[in-house]
Amino acid sequence: YYFENYVNEEALTLFIDPIISFLSLIGLNFFGEDPVSAGFGLFNAGGIIFMIVGISFSKGLADKYGKRDVFMSALFVSTLFIAVFYFFNPENLRLMFLSQILHGFFYGLTIPLLWAMIADVADYSEWKNNRRATAIIFSAMMVGLKGGLSIGGALVASILGYYGYEAGMDQGMNTLFGIKMLISIFPSIPFFVCVFILFFYQIDKKMESKIELDLKSSR
């Protein structure tokens, strides 16, 4: 919706043409001729590539600073790079792509840490209650993920309808504002809430080490 309706197509074409030409020269010409589709493809590809780069840095940072602190900091910074889309006008292609790349990198730091922190919660359960609840904890996480995807998809459709979106039509200013909110402010809110909640998550680096040592000695 953002690329089809909000981004200036002429500015997008001028921005991606040199990139598409270079990629075609080296045999990577799978983005197509349509500038909107090609731009959206490059936009996503840039985020994914730098997300993978971020993942590769995750363990080293977590070992040094602790999973919770790295996860919380990276999630906060990555969310900032979502929120700033609110301030971009339709011609700010460089800033859009740069923000997407930086968001991908910092969000990539959080991906392996999320699952590692879930395992830490299972360890905490065993350490605190002498009973490991791995299956329940991971199942709850999967239910949350699937529920979030379902609710998120429904919310997108509802919000677009609220702002008067009509497929295949030229969108009014109110609808364009809604689309801009959908890529910036609305998705930022739950992430910022998660960052706030993480302040109450007790398993920091010091507690991680204590739990690990205590469990090793008791097993």
Where do the protein language model's features map onto the residues?
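Membrane-embedded alpha-helical bundles of multi-pass transporters/translocases
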Residues: 1-219
